[in-house]
Amino acid sequence: MARLSQEIILDMAEKIIYEKGMEKTTLYDIAGNLNVTHAALYKHYRNKEDLFQKLALRWLEETSREIFAWTQEAGISPDDALHDWLWLLANTKKKRYKTDRKMFLLYTDYIEQNEELVKNHVAHLAQKAEEVSGRTNQGNAIITAFIYFHNPYFASRWEQAGYAELFEDVWQMMK
């Protein structure tokens, strides 16, 4: 077996969480599946909460990579760029929900319970909204206005008829 690393531990934890859920996954489960003692995990993580937090952050970074890497095309207005970026944000979250609903719900439920993770993610989104739009000190308001389209609480509604039209209505009101 390869040398034990944070990445190997996270991969195994994710596999077990997928099967058992977060509440039922223990460090003993993870260690046992890696053929190490649970004490070996403490060389990489302070505790189960630390491991799960790192796992949730990894998932959030992976699923948000395209959103934060987005750059506007040359010649496009800041308003059009913001519209396109917000639509990408909405559709990225929607696609993740459709692709692997179980993991989406597991991770987002976990993240939503951690105020610091939520605060940091929303701040990062707000910063990107300001960068894209050029609207200084308006990022939080922009992200809040479009909360229906990216907050996991509303995920079950993202497939309803009129979703795109509602997005455009909110956009017109904010524009």
Annotate each PLM feature.
Residues 6-7, 27, 49, 53, ...:
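Short, structured helix-loop boundary elements
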Residues 12, 16, 88, 92, ...:
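Amphipathic alpha-helical interface segments
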Residues 87-127, 154:
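Short secondary-structure transition hinges
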Residues 130-157, 162-174:
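Hydrophobic alpha-helical segments that form the core
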Residues 64, 80, 108-140, 162-165:
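Amphipathic alpha-helical packing segments from all-alpha helical-bundle domains
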